[in-house]
Amino acid sequence: MYIYVEVCTHVHAQATDATRPGIHICTYIYAHIYIYIYVYVNVYIQLVISRAEWAEKHSIVEKKREEKGRGAIAMDVVEYREGQAVVQWMRFEAQRKGGASKHRTLSAETGIRGEGE
């Protein structure tokens, strides 16, 4: 761009009043500079807009995935807590019945019933 301006000013200074060939060259150079800037700005704006649209769609998908994941994690936590409550209740029942043997404690923790239960 700097070279274009230098050439243009040099040719413009060399041109005579009668013919003025420098004006045509300068107009040509300035038109090219304007076109390059115009195209570059438009392409850049289109890229920014398309990137923003893509990011918005991507974030919506991520948000849905995150909400779904959160729900699944919440259900796992509820099931885990319910399972812990069942294990604690079984331990309590085993202790209440007069001291649990090794076999009964194991069955209370794992939920597997042994022989004779």
Swiss-Prot record:
Region (Disordered), start-end ranges: 96-117
Q: What else is known?
A: Completely overlaps YIL100C-A.
What is the name attached to this protein's record?
Putative uncharacterized protein YIL100W
